[in-house]
């Protein structure tokens, strides 16, 4: 140490000691406490603009979208305000209504068991009593009626379809609780259908399910007519639906079986051949009409399709797309059922029911990515620009559908059914977004998103698979819409336009108002796991005064936390990973005197085709003048009849361009309301040409000598010439296709695309017009024959 350093060091120590002394005694400071730490930084935020307009896209939300499969007890229905309660699933197909037993089918080794009430022991296992219990809880049951001819003979564990000892095979999988029960597949294993046991006797586990009793029926047979008659009595004689804003005259809801397109997988012990086009149409029509005969108030759902691939294809080796002009299955099925109903003069289909799983596979993803998938994949249901990460995003399985890697599921299904069977609503009786598991909070946020989508996109019936456990946050996601305050107040009845400028994978908003125009409810879902959403809310047509928030968050997943009511502010911050309901009071200065719709708002059209919409009043009484609003390039709408009143519908003609895709348009009304819709432009239509039999003259009451003949040419439609259905109808006389006769008949094209019918002229002289219509799934080409009876 250098000279002088020691004295400097000692001086420094002395100064330090004096400083510590005075600090400890209060010297040198005006306060006894250290200065407070700086406040934590605010959470990261994103800026979002939300625009709500109570005069745009107004429509009543069906109360039946707030449904579930198998809630765990009646209190669940009462607390959540669940409307539709479904008795369904694979086990519903072989359910025996007399002994309350079923077969687990492919879900568990094709083994008999009692109807499973373990998950919901408070419910009756008797299907008839189940209806009564659901109704007493305030819900509306939808019952599944099996269409296969077998039901479980008992609930014994040793009643199995593929006994290893009886059928002497080496099973690929064996029931761990009963060693004689195999899965019906034999070595070499690997999933090939050629390795299935096909010699099994259904009587091992089943008894026949027949429509009605006849002499000589096998012992133990069970009868549908007796069952449905009992169900109808439990539903009640009036059948009326006491639900506001919903015009359906009956609540006797029936699913006509479950996922009938995959019977050869789930129920291959009794249905080994792949389901086929004609089979599924004819079986549905026959059984549906029978149900209507036993219960005149029946509302029948079909075909209860399982999933994307089977919307468009069936597994039959001989009764498939290839033998039906290459028409995609659901368009073909709807078309065929519609034409059969036209011939019969009455409906057999009251709602198109599809299961709406997205087919996205989360199994190989990290937890964070599973959560992100759950919150982005909801776009499968509604976003025209969303390209699915599921397998079919890069594997087209359709023949004629537009942009089939972009599911656009709800508008696509509604467009299809409106084109193929007008006036038929859409049901989605199974769906789930539990990519990270039922208990994960991402599932609750995805559900909050889903319930909003269902109402905005005009689905009529929906039941979640299965009901969320009350211990999980997803339970409260439903209550945001149905019972947010414990007093059974819910989302308002009339959906209105609510849009935003954020990433839809991270943010959603849904809006509704009440008929009086005094309340606006918004559900805001901030799906961003990291960032709060600093949001500017622009309200059009509504003057707000007070707002109360109700929030579901990760920090309080088992309750909906109510905020205090306060004066409206147009700027609000929504924390990350939350779903928030805003209940806003105020006024609508120019509340419309009536509600109207585009009738329909969404429809499918072939490229280059034309469709006419017929705007109508759906409530209230006034007279409106409509005009064309904005529309996407690729379609051209023109108002051809501008008056809409209680006694008159308007008319909007829309001409599609030549590029398949999804095109949006708006129509404005003189009361400042606007309705928007979608045109789904598919591939170009096939052509149908008259090739023989036109312009004939014959004596009245005689058969014209030349059959009325058409030729179907698929062109660029995606179809083929052979196996196409052609619907012939005559203004007088009778048609025959060689098998059936009447004023309306269906003929099928041969391999060259040719179909024909014979015409018997009427008994009186005069002109006769015969119309021939090609498949709706190939653009619905048509031609007209003109004949003369002398």
Feature annotation, model-predicted:
Residues 503-543, 577-585:
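Carbohydrate-binding surface patches
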Residues 596-598, 612-617, 621, 628-790:
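The feature marks long extracellular or luminal low-complexity segments
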Residues 440, 451-521:
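Glycan-recognition and catalytic regions of carbohydrate-active enzymes
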Residues 51-226, 255, 260-276:
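N-terminal substrate-binding region of glycoside hydrolase catalytic domains
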Residues 566-589:
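C-terminal beta-strand-rich structural cap/linker in extracellular carbohydrate-active enzymes
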Residues 218-239, 277-442, 447:
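Noncatalytic carbohydrate-binding groove/subsite architecture in carbohydrate-active enzymes
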Residues 33-76, 234-235, 244, 281, ...:
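N-terminal module-boundary/linker segments of secreted carbohydrate-active enzymes
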Residues 18-44, 673, 678, 782:
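Bacterial Sec-dependent N-terminal signal peptides
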């Amino acid at each position: 140490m250098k000279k002088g350093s020691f004295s400097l060091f000692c001086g420094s120590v002395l100064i330090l000691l004096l400083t510590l002394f005075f600090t400890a005694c209060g010297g040198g400071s005006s306060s006894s406490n250290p200065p407070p730490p700086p406040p934590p930084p605010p959470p990261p935020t994103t800026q979002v603009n939300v625009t709500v307009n109570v005069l745009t896209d107004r429509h009543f939300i069906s109360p039946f979208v707030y449904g579930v499969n198998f809630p765990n007890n009646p209190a669940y229905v009462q607390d959540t305000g669940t409307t539709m309660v479904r008795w369904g699933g694979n086990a519903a197909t072989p359910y025996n209504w007399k002994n309350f037993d079923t077969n687990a089918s492919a879900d568990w080794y094709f083994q008999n068991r009692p109807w499973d009430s373990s998950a919901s022991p408070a419910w009756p296992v008797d299907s008839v009593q189940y209806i009564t219990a659901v109704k007493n809880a305030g819900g509306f049951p939808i019952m599944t009626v099996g269409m296969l001819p077998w039901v479980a003979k008992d609930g014994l564990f040793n009643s199995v379809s593929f006994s290893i000892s009886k059928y002497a095979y080496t099973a690929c999988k064996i029931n761990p609780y009963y060693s004689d029960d195999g899965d019906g597949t034999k070595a070499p294993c690997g999933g090939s259908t050629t390795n299935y046991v096909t010699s099994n006797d259904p009587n091992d586990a089943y008894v026949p399910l027949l429509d009605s009793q006849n002499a000589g029926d096998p012992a133990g047979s069970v009868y549908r007519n007796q069952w449905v008659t009992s169900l109808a009595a439990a539903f009640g004689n009036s059948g009326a639906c006491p639900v506001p804003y919903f015009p359906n005259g009956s609540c006797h809801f029936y699913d006509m079986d479950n996922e009938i397109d995959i019977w050869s997988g789930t129920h291959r012990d009794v249905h080994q051949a792949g389901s086929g086009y004609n089979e599924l149409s004819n079986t549905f029509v026959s059984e549906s009409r029978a149900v209507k005969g036993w219960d005149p108030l029946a509302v029948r759902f079909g075909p209860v399709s399982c999933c994307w691939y089977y919307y468009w294809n069936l597994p039959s080796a001989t009764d498939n797309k290839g033998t039906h002009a290459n028409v995609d299955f659901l368009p073909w099925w709807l078309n065929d059922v519609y034409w059969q109903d036209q011939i019969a003069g009455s409906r057999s289909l009251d709602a198109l029911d599809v299961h709406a799983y997205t087919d996205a596979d989360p199994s190989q993803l990290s937890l964070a990515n599973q959560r992100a998938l759950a919150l982005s994949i909801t776009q499968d249901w509604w976003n025209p620009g969303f390209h699915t990460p599921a397998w079919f995003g890069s594997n087209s399985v359709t023949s004629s559908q537009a942009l089939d890697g972009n599911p656009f599921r709800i508008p696509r299904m509604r467009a299809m059914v409106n084109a193929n069977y007008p006036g038929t609503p859409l049901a989605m009786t199974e769906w789930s977004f539990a990519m990270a598991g039922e208990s994960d909070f991402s599932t609750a946020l995805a559900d909050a998103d889903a319930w909003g989508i269902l109402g905005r996109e005009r689905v009529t019936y929906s039941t979640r698979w299965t009901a969320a456990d009350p211990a999980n946050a997803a339970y409260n996601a439903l209550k945001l819409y149905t019972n947010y305050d414990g007093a059974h107040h819910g989302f308002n009845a009339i959906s209105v336009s609510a849009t935003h400028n954020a990433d839809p994978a991270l943010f959603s908003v849904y809006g509704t108002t009440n008929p009086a125009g005094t309340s606006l409810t918004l559900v805001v879902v901030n799906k961003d796991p990291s960032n709060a959403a600093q949001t500017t809310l622009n309200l059009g047509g509504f003057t707000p005064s007070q707002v109360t928030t109700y929030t579901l968050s990760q920090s309080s997943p088992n309750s909906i936390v109510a905020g205090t009511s306060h004066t409206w502010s147009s700027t609000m911050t929504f924390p990350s990973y939350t779903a928030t309901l805003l209940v806003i009071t105020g006024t609508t200065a120019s509340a419309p005197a009536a509600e109207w719709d585009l009738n329909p708002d969404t429809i499918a059209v072939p490229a280059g085709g034309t469709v006419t919409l017929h705007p109508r009043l759906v409530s209230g009484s006034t007279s409106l003048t409509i005009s064309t609003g904005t529309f996407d390039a690729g379609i051209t709408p023109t108002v051809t009849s501008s008056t809409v009143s209680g006694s008159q519908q308007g008319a909007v003609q829309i001409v599609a361009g030549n590029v398949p895709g999804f095109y949006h348009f708006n129509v404005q009304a003189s009361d400042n309301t606007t309705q928007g819709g979608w045109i789904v432009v598919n591939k170009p239509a096939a052509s149908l040409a008259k090739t023989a039999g036109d312009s004939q003259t014959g004596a009245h009451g005689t058969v014209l000598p030349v059959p009325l003949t058409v030729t179907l040419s698929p062109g660029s439609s995606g179809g083929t010439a052979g196996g196409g259905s052609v619907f012939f109808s005559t203004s007088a006389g009778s048609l025959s296709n060689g098998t059936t006769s009447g004023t309306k008949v269906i003929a099928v094209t041969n391999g060259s695309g040719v179909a024909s019918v014979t015409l018997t002229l009427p008994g009186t002289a005069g002109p006769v017009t015969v119309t021939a219509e090609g498949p709706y799934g190939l653009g619905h080409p048509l031609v007209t024959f003109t004949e003369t009876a002398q």
